[in-house]
Amino acid sequence: GEALPRNLAEELLPRVSALWNMYGPTETTIWSTIERVESATGSVPIGRPIDNTQIYILDAYDNAVPAGVIGGLCIGGRGTALGYLNRPELTAERFIENPIPGCDGIIYRTGDLARIRRDGTLECLGRTDHQVKLRGFRIELGEIETQLDQLDTVAQAVAIVREDVAGDARLVAYIVPAGTGEPSSVDLQAALGETLPDYMV
C-alpha cells in the first residue's frame, strides 16, 4: 500500500460516511495502526496501534525517541512474524529483539520513518532509504515531500538530490500543481521555510 495523500482524502471525505487510514506491512499481519480521518488538513496520520500491537520510534542506536522526533518505525506484538522463510540475513536485519528496557519479544524494522504527533497519533514520513546527507546535514526527503503535499497548490511532490555539476549536489523538488495555477518556486520555498529548517529548503 501507499500513503493516503491529503488531496485524495479531501476528495473522498464528502463522498463516504467514514474514511479510515490503515497502515501495516505484511510482516506484521497486514494492519498495525488505524485512524479515522476527520479532515484533510495537513498530512494524514496513520493513527494509533491496534490491539495487541506496539509501535516504537527508534533512533539509529535503537533508543526510543521522544514525541515529535523522527525515527525508524518498528512494530511488535502478537501479529509480528518471526522472520522470513529461508532468508536468515534479511531476518537478522529486520527482526530484532526489542531493545526497549522491560519490553520483550521480537520487533520488526519497517524501513519507514515516522514521528509521534502532539495528539499521540503517528505520522509516516517516507522510507529510511529515502534519507540523504547533504552538506553535513541529514535530510529526510520524505518530510520535504510531506510538507509540499500539504500545500493547497500542490497535488503531488517528489524530492531528490540532483548533481548537475560534479560536487555540486542540491535539493530539487518536482511537483504536480493542484488546480489550474502553478505555484512559483519562491512561494514554495517560503511555505517550506515555515515548517522546515533552512538546510531542507
Each language-model region and where it sits:
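Conserved lysine of the Walker
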Residues: 27
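Short, well-ordered alpha-helical microsegments
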Residues: 5-6, 30, 141
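Short gly/Ser/Thr-rich phosphate-binding loop of adenylate-forming enzymes
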Residues: 1-18, 52, 61
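AMP-dependent adenylate-forming
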Residues: 18-21, 36-201
